[in-house]
Amino acid sequence: MAAAIAASALPGAFGRLVSVCSRSILASQGSGSASLWSASRRFNSQSASYPQGYVPKTSLSSPPWQEVVLPDPVEETRHHAEVVKRVNELIATGQYGRLFAVVHFASHQWKVTAEDLILIENELDIKCGERIRLEKVLLVGADNFTLLGKPLLRKELVRVEATVIEKTESWPKINMKFRKRKNFRKKKIIVNPQTILRINTIEIAPRLL
């Protein structure tokens, strides 16, 4: 009889224990969510105190090097006009010395001056003795000035002429392949066509535009 009473009382006690535990867990969760909510409100209030477009000071927002100050456009224009005037005076009086140029020809860039020889590892469809004009001029310069192209100088500003003086072949190059104990041996002789040009003149316009 006593055992039956104890067995009947056990489910009720267990149910009360479960309800008490669930209430304590819910209460703890409620306090935690409330604390998180209050913390988020404090963070939002602190972030709202910064001005709009605020960027924290870091190595990216504030680089360690000095800020580049661009020149005044009016002053730059005046200085450019003075330089052009001085270069025009040097060209008009012929007091610029020996001219040199950088030309682009046959997929290469060549720094040349008058009476220079350039060897081109290619065959050109030009006969010996013919005179050609090198139109792709990247820059031309003298002792006191240099004119740079962006990327090329205008054709009416500078003129570089050359003459084909020789068309020949390169010295034979032997390419030998050998594998030991494989009875493999391969020999190849490479001969490339060559063209030699002589730079005749480098002329510049009498006045810069």
Swiss-Prot record:
Main location as per UniProt: mitochondrion
Molecular function GO terms recorded: RNA binding; structural constituent of ribosome
Gene name, Swiss-Prot/TrEMBL: Mrpl21
Subunit-level organization: Component of the mitochondrial ribosome large subunit (39S) which comprises a 16S rRNA and about 50 distinct proteins.
Species assigned in the record: Mus musculus (Mouse)
Keyword Transit peptide: yes
Lineage, broadest ranks: Eukaryota, Metazoa, Chordata, Craniata, Vertebrata
Protein name: Large ribosomal subunit protein bL21m
A Pfam family per the record: Ribosomal_L21p
GO cellular component, one term: mitochondrial inner membrane
InterPro entries attached to this UniProt entry: bL21-like (IPR028909), bL21-like_sf (IPR036164), Ribosomal_bL21 (IPR001787)
